[in-house]
Swiss-Prot record:
GO-annotated cellular components: endoplasmic reticulum membrane; ERMES complex
BP term (GO), one: protein insertion into mitochondrial outer membrane
Transmembrane parts of this sequence: 118-138
Organism, scientific name: Zygosaccharomyces rouxii (strain ATCC 2623 / CBS 732 / NBRC 1130 / NCYC 568 / NRRL Y-229)
Recorded superkingdom: Eukaryota
Biased segments, Basic and acidic residues type: 435-454
Recorded family membership: Belongs to the MMM1 family.
Name the record gives this protein: Maintenance of mitochondrial morphology protein 1
Disulfide bonds: none
GO molecular function, one term: lipid binding
Residues covered by region (Disordered): 144-164, 434-454
First-listed, main subcellular location of the protein, grouped into a coarse class: endoplasmic reticulum
Function, in words: Component of the ERMES/MDM complex, which serves as a molecular tether to connect the endoplasmic reticulum (ER) and mitochondria. Components of this complex are involved in the control of mitochondrial shape and protein biogenesis, and function in nonvesicular lipid trafficking between the ER and mitochondria. Preferentially binds to glycerophospholipids such as phosphatidylcholoine (PC), phosphatidic acid (PA), phosphatidylglycerol (PG), and phosphatidylserine (PS), but not to phosphatidylethanolamine (PE).
Comment block on domains: The SMP-LTD domain is a barrel-like domain that can bind various types of glycerophospholipids in its interior and mediate their transfer between two adjacent bilayers.
Amino acid sequence: MESNYTGMDGNWALNGTVSVGNGTLISVDEFLHNALPMHLQALFQDGNSQGPLLTMEDLEKAIEFKRASQELVNDNVLAPDGLFVELLRQQEKTLPRLISATSNTQGSFSSWSFAQGLIVGQVSVVLVLIFFIKFFIFSDSSTKTNPNPAKNSSSTNSLSGLSSESRSFISPHFFTSIMNRKGNEQAESNDDENERSRQIDDILEKTYYNVDTHPAESLDWFNVLIGQTIQQLREEAWKKDNIVYSLNAFIERKAQELPSYLDSIKITELDIGHDFPIFSNCRIQYSPNSNGRKLEAKIDIDLNDRLAVGIETRLLLNYPKPLTASLPINVTVSIIRFQACLTVSLTKAEEFVPTSPESVDEDDNDGYFLMFSFAPEYRMEFETQSLIGARSKLENIPKIGSLVEYQIKKWFVERCVEPRFQFIKLPSVWPRSKNTREGKADVDESEPGRETHY
């Protein structure tokens, strides 16, 4: 059924055709299926960025317009010109609002989803932290011993009633027990340190010694005892030549370790001196980095004497063939002056680390040790005499003297200079029967019970 009405504005024809903007006439069917969707798409794109929000009245008008359009298509009848134009105008006003409202709704929905997720995430993190602090840090340890056996048995029964799935998870008290165990070990170590500090303070108080104000001591009595000991060692060395024999035997055992260009070494001179070391300026102080748990004695030592050893050997020239020639060498090295600060203290073996695996002896780890070392600011003066050659001899070559002095100082630093120490195990002072002795009496007369014949 065709419409007999003609639009007043010239856009609608009598036969039900529509005149577009360029003057072309199209049918209503083509307008609804082709031109109208394109027009709506353009309106949708323009309405993404502007337009008021959609109201309920706009939605109702859009629904009425859609229903009227469907009726027009089904009946193939156009409404009166004024009504249809009004519907088109309402459509042009309603669709941009609908599109803009939809886009605004989607934007607000996405913004709200992001804010909601952020808030939920922050709240979940806070809850996890609160749970961890409450149950893992401030909870009581389950490893405490319970004096009531009935409670222990009931707790055992309750634990046995748990399912295997719940037992597979680590209990929060597990971490708490580990933390408490470490805290107990640290507390025990602190108690031991406090006990040592208390013992040191007690000793200083009962011996009337103030580490801060006590003057340094001269150690004259100690010098006398050391002098007697050294004199006894010298007498034994002079009479029996024990030191020379032991040194030669030691060199013979180490002969295989000598380089191929050296012949056997022999001791020709040994001088153990005539004077004695002087110990002075002794002061007791706390050991560094001990926090008052250990005492040590600082003693100045001064030795002005001649300690000499002389050797002879041959330098073998093995080129172009072995034993082509040999060069005799005689060297005498003397220490004429030694000054240093000696550190002496009592300690245990477990307080220090050995420098080599060979020095570890499990039998010597018990008991106390006398530890001594020298400060790095020591002074050691040498006097070296050298003689090279058989007929044409070279005397006192400086290079030989410097080489010998370097090796001696290197040996001394690696063994006795801080931070290296030397340990001497102290014997047990507890009275024992095998250590009991008595003086030997001189017998002038013959033994009793034995007859004397004249």
